[in-house]
């Protein structure tokens, strides 16, 4: 049979059409024996090869044969049944991938926002289970601190101010801290810290407004609020917990060593 020849399969009532070369990738599989007529369990019915197996699960098998990758839906839960189907077709590379089931499970990304409002200042500390989330927020958040650009004149007792942009502090890979509002300096001057969070171009000094913008940013990134609590009854630090389900990676075969597998990011 030519590799470019089309083959129609009826798997449990679901009809699939593909090239014979797609089904011939693994010479030791039952699909290969099905095509050359050596496996008598498969019958030709009205021009279609009838396979008395699960057609829904076969769609994932055919996708694997076409792409050399296994990418399952986030809510997929039939790993054992799919592995049983892979064993039936004697597709050992697919069986090996399914043995890495823990890599196929969706993983939650967690974020906690600690917020403390005290007098005219507000303090933020953001913890993230995924360092990439913290890196994303660090790239979007800018702290603007008032700095005198010229001394006060005799006609004006207030010095001219400019805004110095600074990134939030990163105590570790998994958290960042920043604050906003007004604070007093050693020269008895009151200076204001503003916060800007891209793509919003506003500079906000009010802690409640900054908290709202930060929450909106996380929601737009696919996180959802799962709970709130008071961390400390003494200083009234509020904690907002967020979660985002990360889609599983695609598992791909190593093309040089068929028995090995490589994690491929989802396209």
Swiss-Prot record:
It is found in: Endoplasmic reticulum. The keyword Metal-binding does not apply. GO terms for biological process: negative regulation of delayed rectifier potassium channel activity; protein homooligomerization. Gene3D superfamilies: Potassium Channel Kv1.1, Chain A. Residues 5-74 form the BTB domain. Transmembrane segments: none annotated. Its main location: endoplasmic reticulum. GO terms for molecular function: identical protein binding. One of its GO terms (cellular component) is endoplasmic reticulum. InterPro entries: BTB/POZ_dom, SKP1/BTB/POZ_sf, T1-type_BTB. Keywords: Endoplasmic reticulum. Pfam families: BTB_2. Can form homooligomers. Interacts with KCNA1 (via cytoplasmic N-terminal domain) and KCNA4. Inhibits potassium fluxes in cells. May regulate Kv1 family channel proteins by retaining a fraction of channels in endomembranes. This is Potassium channel regulatory protein. The gene is KCNRG.
């Amino acid at each position: 049979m030519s590799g470019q020849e089309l083959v129609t399969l009826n798997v449990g009532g679901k009809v699939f059409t593909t090239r014979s070369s797609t089904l011939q990738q693994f010479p030791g599989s039952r699909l290969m024996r099905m095509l050359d007529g050596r496996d008598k369990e498969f019958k030709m019915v009205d021009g279609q090869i009838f396979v008395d197996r699960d057609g829904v699960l076969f769609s994932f098998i055919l996708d694997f044969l076409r792409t050399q990758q296994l990418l399952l839906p986030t809510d997929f839960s039939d790993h054992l049944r799919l592995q049983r189907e892979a064993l039936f077709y004697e597709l050992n590379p697919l069986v090996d991938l399914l043995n890495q089931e823990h890599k196929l499970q969706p993983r939650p990304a967690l974020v906690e926002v600690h917020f403390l409002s005290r007098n005219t200042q507000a303090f933020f500390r953001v913890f993230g289970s995924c360092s990439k989330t913290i890196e994303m927020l660090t790239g979007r958040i800018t702290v603007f601190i008032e700095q005198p650009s010229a001394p006060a004149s005799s006609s004006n007792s207030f010095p001219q101010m400019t805004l110095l942009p600074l990134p939030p502090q990163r105590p570790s890979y998994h958290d960042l801290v920043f604050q906003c509002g007004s604070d007093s300096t050693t020269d008895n001057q009151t200076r204001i810290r503003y916060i800007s969070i891209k793509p919003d171009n506003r500079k906000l000094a009010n802690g409640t407004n900054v908290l709202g913008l930060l929450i909106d940013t996380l929601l737009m990134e696919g996180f959802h609020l799962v709970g709130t609590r008071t961390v400390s009854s003494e200083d009234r630090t509020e904690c907002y917990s967020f979660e985002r389900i990360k889609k599983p990676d695609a598992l791909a075969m190593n093309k040089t060593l068929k028995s090995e597998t490589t994690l491929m990011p989802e396209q």
